[in-house]
């Protein structure tokens, strides 16, 4: 599928079939996501693929509200994205490179996460990015290494729904020429 079609047809999927997601597919998706641009090519995003039902259940029940619990319980795989802290947007001495301070880390992770989701869509997998959960508790459960920060949880699986295209803003609302 071409890039424009992939971008325009990807939807957030919240209902999944029970079919397992292969390790090879996830490896291919992460490889593709590694091509996402990042600050000075720091490539700070890391991925944790979670298929262990007990681990998924703990994250669902101990870290999430009801809506995200349903998604995680239904998804055959949960992927957590982390970043290596204090690299993206920082100088070697630890000072900020830009006025955005440490926010650049989230920007880079967002680019990598979107690229991950597009690569998954190209393989016929659905994804939904979740940001509302107890980050500290989830990081503890996942044993996120020291020096990394947990950023997002992504439900991954074969879609069991075909959501409509959500209403989009007009180009006139989004773009200004000066």
Language model segments and positions:
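C-terminal helix-cap and adjacent tail motif
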Residues: 3-13, 18, 87, 92, ...
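A structural motif
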Residues: 26-34
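Small-aliphatic-rich amphipathic alpha-helix that forms the alpha element of a beta-alpha
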Residues: 33-34, 79, 97-141
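Glycine/small-residue-rich phosphate/adenosyl-binding loop
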Residues: 41-109
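A glycine-rich helix N-cap at a beta->alpha junction
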Residues: 68-78, 143-165
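Short secondary-structure boundary segments
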Residues: 83, 132, 158
């Amino acid at each position: 599928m071409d890039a424009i079609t992939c971008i325009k047809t990807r939807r957030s999927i919240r209902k999944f079939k029970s079919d397992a997601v292969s390790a090879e597919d996830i490896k291919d998706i992460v490889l593709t996501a590694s091509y996402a641009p990042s600050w000075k090519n720091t490539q700070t995003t890391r991925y944790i693929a979670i298929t262990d039902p007990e681990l998924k259940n703990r994250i669902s029940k101990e870290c999430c509200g009801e809506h995200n619990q349903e998604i995680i319980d239904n998804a055959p795989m949960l992927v957590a994205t982390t970043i290596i802290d204090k690299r993206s947007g920082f100088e070697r001495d630890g000072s900020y490179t830009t006025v955005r301070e440490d926010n650049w880390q989230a920007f880079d992770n967002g680019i990598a996460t979107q690229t991950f989701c597009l690569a998954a869509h190209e393989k016929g997998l659905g994804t939904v990015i979740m940001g509302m959960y107890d980050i500290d508790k989830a990081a503890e459960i996942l044993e996120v290494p020291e020096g990394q920060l947990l950023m997002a949880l992504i439900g991954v699986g074969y879609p069991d729904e075909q959501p409509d295209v959500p209403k989009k803003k007009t180009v006139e609302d989004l773009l200004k020429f000066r």
